Amino acid sequence: VKAAGHDTQCAVAAMPWDGIGEAAFLSCGTWSLIGCELEKPILTRRSMEDELSNEIGANNQINYLKNISGLWLIQEIRRNFREEGREYSYNDMEQLARTEPSFACFIDPDASEFAQPGGMPEKIRAYCERTGQEVPQTDGALIRCIYESLSMKYRNAIAQIHENTGKKF
């Protein structure tokens, strides 16, 4: 038995999957890792261009995955709100997001301007303005923008994994 090398690999190895059909995983923390298990790595140019990687997991299974900026954006915007005197729990933030219209604007969570701490509300607004989208004005709209942008990023990653593996999730 070969042990998994880090926490995400351990979580993937422990997934309750009955072996019927295809299964994908999403490990979402500061970073998000989304992918599937394979018996052999995929080493194609397309896979490389899609920024998909092969990691050896438990029992020599391949964790074929994409790294995505995850809840870092939520953690950072929460810190920015706190600095401005607005203290929100994560539940509060979810409720604020639920009050806003859906699909008003999207960001690329992996865009370089979001990698550094500080000024996240302004960075999101500037991104939306620069890309000709509705600019989020409220805390809830900013939060919803992040959550929906992550969801779209995950959807796109699953599509890339499907295109590279042929697996349907």
Regions found by a protein language model. Give the residues of each.
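Active-site core segments that coordinate phosphate-bearing ligands/cofactors
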Residues: 2-169
